[in-house]
């Protein structure tokens, strides 16, 4: 079994694949750039995670808070702001429809949304970045199983 972080990314990717605006163009990597033929698209990845030993448990457990990012990308046309808002709306509704991610985590909350525009390539690109704070728990030393 994989680390709970990977399980969370996989769950999020499954949740955002097939949205109305981006369809099957959902990816789990930010390493490779998206060419204009793959836009509009969304990607999901995780950033930082804070872990603390739980003070309220008989066994050693860790309470974890993970920041997961979903980024939407569109070609920057006249209506790119509207399209980015539509992607953000679809992502937010899909992920927050089940704030336990099928029982994998304790809670998910949206903590921020940012938009940006990059006009330095052949095809300008607009982006929206949604940050989700995900709370989950593991037994200390067993990071592959959420409890």
Predicted segments with their positions:
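Charged, amphipathic alpha-helical segments and their flanking helix caps
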Residues: 1-35, 46-147
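A short glycine-rich, His/Asp/Glu-containing loop-to-beta-strand
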Residues: 40-44
């Amino acid at each position: 079994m994989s680390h709970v972080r990977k399980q969370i990314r996989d769950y999020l990717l499954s949740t955002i694949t097939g949205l109305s605006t981006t369809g099957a163009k959902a990816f789990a990597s930010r390493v490779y750039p998206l060419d204009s033929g793959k836009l509009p698209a969304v990607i999901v990845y995780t950033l930082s995670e804070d872990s603390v030993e739980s003070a309220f448990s008989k066994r050693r457990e860790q309470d974890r808070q993970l920041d997961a990012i979903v980024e939407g990308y569109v070609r920057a046309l006249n209506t790119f702001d509207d399209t980015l808002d539509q992607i953000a709306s679809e992502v937010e509704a899909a992920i927050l429809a089940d704030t336990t991610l099928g029982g994998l985590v304790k809670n998910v909350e949206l903590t921020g949304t940012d938009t940006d525009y990059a006009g330095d390539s052949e095809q300008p690109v607009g982006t929206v970045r949604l940050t989700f704070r995900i709370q989950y728990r593991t037994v200390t030393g067993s990071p592959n199983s959420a409890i």
